[in-house]
Amino acid sequence: FDMPDMTEESFAEHRAAECSSLSVHHNSYLLAAFLLAYRYKKNPVYLEIGRRGLETLMAAYPETELEHSETQEKCRLVFPLAALYDATKDEKHREMLYRVVADLEKVKHPSGGYYEWDTEYRAKYSRVSSTECSLLTENGDPVADLLYSVNWLPIGFAYAYYATGDEWFRQLWKDIVGFC
């Protein structure tokens, strides 16, 4: 979306278009914003955009486009998926949220942080250092990215707790804020 130049016509075009980018990095929080707008304005168009976009990303998950690491993309999905479940209360959306967090938990460090991980090192910036690059050198290195990854988790886990009422998310929130 080119928000500064958004008109009713261009908004309708974007709404009708198929999702052409499977980038969690670039799409997930915009989709969450539509879901929050739906929560407050009750405009079903906002729900449709957020739902369709996140369902498209999750249909490709875990093979979405990666920027820096798998960890980063999973961290960026928690809040949007919690917002989706909060908006719909659909069990399949709840399952999406739990799936991503369960996958993320596989790289949790006892300190409460999350290792950067990139199976097959396929992220866009995994082995490139000409502009910016991942902090990850090798999977298993004791490094957590506080700029691109775990910084998304406090709000994600807090909202997941709000949306689900599950104490597990409250504990995850406590763990990550203790780490940060």
Predicted regions: what is each one?
Residues 1-180:
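Glycan-recognition and catalytic cores of secretory/periplasmic carbohydrate-active enzymes
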